[in-house]
Structures are given as C-alpha cells and as structure tokens.
Amino acid sequence: MQAINRIIAPLKRGLQLLVSRAVVSVVNDAYARQNLQLRLQSEEVADDVERFQNYGHYSVPKAGEAIVVSVGGKRSHLVAVVVDDKSVRPAGLIAGDSVLYHLEGHQLRLTENGEAILSCKKFTIETDTLDCSAQQITFDSPQTTFTGNVDIMGISTATDHQSSGISGKNHDHEERVGKPVP
C-alpha cells in the first residue's frame, strides 16, 4: 500500500495544486493581456500571472481575490480565470438579475420584465446620431438644457409656454391685439 501511495502522491499533489485561490496584490495593465501579482498559499507569491477576461468586457480590478489554474498542472504557469472583490459586490439582486458595476457604486442593473436601471452621477453619450424610439419618455429634472435648436414635430400639450420669462398663455401684445385665443 505504501508503494502505491508513493506512486500516486505526486499525482495527488498536482491535482490539489491545479486550481487555487489567491489574493491579488498588484495589477499590471500595460501588456496585451493583463498581468497580476498574486499571493497564494502561505507565503507563495506568483508574478506575471495572465488574467483572462470575457470577450467584449474588460476591467482593471483593485486588490481582491482570484481563482487561478495551473496550466498543464505546472505551478510555474498560472492563469487567473476569475478576479472578484466581495467588499464592493452589489447585494440585493434577485435570481436572474445581472449587474455591471464600479467599485464607487455606479451600476447598470438588468432586472426582470425587460427593465434596465442605470445609477450614476453623470451619464455621457458620445455619438454622431442618437435615435430613441419609445412609447413614452419622461424627463424629471428641475432644469433641462438644450444647446442646439429644438424641432417639435408633434403638438405640444403644455398648458403654457414661456420665452424669456414671458408667458405665451397670458401675454398681451403691445399692439392691443389681445391675449391669445384658446
């Protein structure tokens, strides 16, 4: 039995070291693929660990935790497949929700019934043309500013329009034409 244990001991050790937890110490985003410095078991430090990310999404994490895989079972060839920081992870989501978030708290949350909720201090869109198609749009803001011309193609249903502080509803022309007729 000891002979068998001696034979399988290296295999067992290799399997145990195949997937590991780690703590992210340093992130280097200067390479084609992001590299990490990780602290693994006890005092083991791994430098230049490649971090793989999902196509179309990229992030630069702060210190956090990682799951690393030893490629080919070699501890000298580690790759990080997941990096996370549970201290800033959004909480309170329900099954099926998905969220893209920043450590400062702003986020885009996709929820049930086709709802997307964007929470942030400032939202900037940079595009040549913006087309918006909706059944209804509501702007709830104490101040709205348009820097260019505004063309209204439909009928304005506002009860009054003001220009330069003058009411269109109650305005009386100097030529004594009278107030606008409703």
From Swiss-Prot:
Residues 169-182 have a biased composition (Basic and acidic residues). Residues 159-182 are annotated as: Disordered. It comes from the Bacteria. To phage Mu protein gp45. This is Mu-like prophage FluMu protein gp45. It comes from Haemophilus influenzae (strain ATCC 51907 / DSM 11121 / KW20 / Rd).
